[in-house]
Amino acid sequence: MKPTTVSTLRQWKQQGEKFASITAYDFSFARLFADEGIQVMLVGDSLGMVVQGHDSTLPVTLADIVYHTEVVRRGAPAALLLADLPFMSYATPEQTFDSAARLMRAGANMVKLEGGKWLAETVKQLTERAVPVCGHLGLTPQSVNIFGGYKVQGRDAEAADLLLEDALALEAAGMQLLVLECVPVALAKRVTEALSIPVIGIGAGNATDGQILVMHDAFGITGGHIPKFAKNFLAETGDIRAAVRQYVEEVKAGSYPAEQHSFQ
């Protein structure tokens, strides 16, 4: 299979072709996802909650992400593979370069970091050193203690304007992809249309260029609180492969996420 690249995603955006992505943490699921049509995967620090059993992403280490990136890459050699820079792994320029280099050597095509325009210089420096960057705005889980919980972001006009400013500043600094999490549909549409780079949504409505789900949410195996934006595709199909195919098909058709999965 021909490798999926950032250029592929840009072409899809230009053509109005939506795409599905998902988190992956191991070889077998990565291979299954690739077999069923998912070409973009994220080794997310969400593994701290759904794999390791923590109550947040904060305990996840760089070594954790490196390990899971290596095994996911073996399962999906042609996928565009994103890897999270975990909490406090990009606090200084030197630390950032070292962390990013380790993830790229492990098989990542791009590193993802959380934060606004204050990270513009970091994005610029990584890009200049041949490390592609995916940004993450809206609800950024590493900032859960600042937000006071997992809450929808950008609901008032001022917050929405600031988020758009952040997105534009990061794009100008060299960001090549953006994840928007838990923001109102109208704001996600506004950001997606304002940026030339692809935007992936999670809890951001269906106006974004792509969608991403934590795999455990897509299969209904998280237990406890179920996010509003999640849909249990396994419950409807009874088969993991069929569930993945349905997820891909609904994203491409624009039927997922529906209104009940979105914030106004």
From Swiss-Prot:
It holds the Pfam family Pantoate_transf. GO terms for cellular component: cytoplasm. The keyword Manganese does not apply. Its main location: cytoplasm. Pathway: Cofactor biosynthesis; (R)-pantothenate biosynthesis; (R)-pantoate from 3-methyl-2-oxobutanoate: step 1/2. One of its GO terms (molecular function) is 3-methyl-2-oxobutanoate hydroxymethyltransferase activity. Catalyzes the reversible reaction in which hydroxymethyl group from 5,10-methylenetetrahydrofolate is transferred onto alpha-ketoisovalerate to form ketopantoate. Homodecamer; pentamer of dimers. This is 3-methyl-2-oxobutanoate hydroxymethyltransferase. It comes from Erwinia tasmaniensis (strain DSM 17950 / CFBP 7177 / CIP 109463 / NCPPB 4357 / Et1/99). The lineage of its organism: Bacteria, Pseudomonadati, Pseudomonadota, Gammaproteobacteria, Enterobacterales. The gene is panB.
